[in-house]
Swiss-Prot record:
Keyword Ribonucleoprotein found: yes
Family: Belongs to the universal ribosomal protein uS3 family.
GO MF annotation list: mRNA binding; rRNA binding; structural constituent of ribosome
Entry annotated with the keyword Ribonucleoprotein: yes
Species name: Mycoplasma pneumoniae (strain ATCC 29342 / M129 / Subtype 1)
Gene3D superfamilies for the chain: 3.30.300.20, Ribosomal protein S3, C-terminal domain (3.30.1140.32)
Protein name, UniProt field: Small ribosomal subunit protein uS3
Transmembrane segments annotated in the record for this chain: none
Listed Polar residues bias regions: 244-265
Chain intervals for the UniProt region annotation (Disordered): 244-273
Signal peptide positions on this chain: none
Biological processes annotated in GO: translation
InterPro entries, alphabetized: KH_dom (IPR004087), KH_dom-like_a/b (IPR015946), KH_dom_type_2 (IPR004044), KH_sf_prok-type (IPR009019), Ribosomal_S3_C_sf (IPR036419), Ribosomal_uS3_bac-typ (IPR005704), Ribosomal_uS3_C (IPR001351), Ribosomal_uS3_CS (IPR018280)
């Protein structure tokens, strides 16, 4: 089951909070608000790609709308003297209606490389820039694992490298328990527009297990920022066998010498013949 369904949708209400939180009064209002939420998310994901937006959460009442944006580069959303925020606020009010009270909150992500959407978008940009597919996928794997992820799965499908027949290519590194509901797995789908057609990019990132009760208000990569890697430039190089003890044989130096001498003095069967 976990291999087939959307990994985010499978965990909503269990260890992930819903990205749209509201209650409508009628079916018509439900359809209207769903379309508006999709337009608001596309506004950030398409028009503000430089900000590297990871997630957009929306809370509504009948009179207010609260939008929470999680981005790796919030400066592109804020702008100088909050000019971009004013522009974004006007664009959102054109979608939801000017009479609705809007509250826009922008949060910075601590570890962008643990966001599946950011990794998928970077990989799609590399494909559009005609970077070799294997190189781009390998670089994405290395970035995520260095950031502290427990595992990553990348699937790219379409006319890869301009091939006549569409195919898919997949890389998996580390643990990827898609059927374990307590696993904090982030999933995202992005599209790369190439001259040969559309190439789909899917990314799954395993950020560890969640054992606490309740839903997280913010994603795990915001609660647990990226750890600094230790500086190993000034350390002495260590040889492969340094510090290892032969505990299985428990041989001292004299025992090794006597055993080697006995092996040399022992006659062979061929010499007897």
């Amino acid at each position: 089951m976990g291999q087939k369904v959307n990994s985010n949708g499978l965990r909503f209400g269990i260890n992930k909070n819903w990205i749209s939180r509201w209650t409508a009064n009628s079916h018509a209002q439900t359809a209207k608000w769903l379309i508006e939420d999709e337009k608001i998310r596309n506004l950030f994901f398409v028009n503000y790609r430089n900000a590297q937006v990871s997630n957009v959460e929306i809370e509504r009442t009948q009179a207010t709308v609260d939008v929470f944006v999680y981005a790796a580069q919030p400066a592109f959303l804020i702008g100088s003297e909050n000019k971009n925020i004013q522009k974004i606020t006007k664009q959102i009010k054109q979608i939801i209606g000017r009479t609705t009270n809007l509250d826009l909150t922008i949060n910075e992500i601590g570890s962008p490389m643990l966001s599946a959407r950011i990794i998928a978008r970077d990989l799609a940009n590399a494909i559009e820039a005609r970077v070799p597919l294997r190189t781009a996928m390998r670089q994405s794997l290395i970035k995520v694992l260095k950031a502290g992820a427990n595992g990553i799965k990348v699937l790219v499908s379409g006319r890869l490298n301009g091939a006549e027949i569409a195919r898919d290519k997949m890389y998996i590194e580390g643990n990827m328990p898609l059927s374990t509901l307590r696993a904090d797995i982030d999933y995202a789908l992005e599209k790369a527009q190439t001259t040969y057609g559309v190439i789909g990019v899917k990314v799954w990132i395993n950020r560890g297990m969640i054992y606490t009760k309740g839903l997280n208000r913010t994603p795990a990569h915001i609660l647990h920022p990226q750890k600094k890697q230790p500086n190993r430039q000034n350390q002495q190089p260590r040889h492969f066998n340094q510090g290892q003890v032969l505990s299985a044989n428990k041989l001292t130096g004299s025992d090794v010498e006597t055993s080697s001498i006995q092996a040399l003095t022992k006659p062979n069967k061929e010499d007897k013949q």
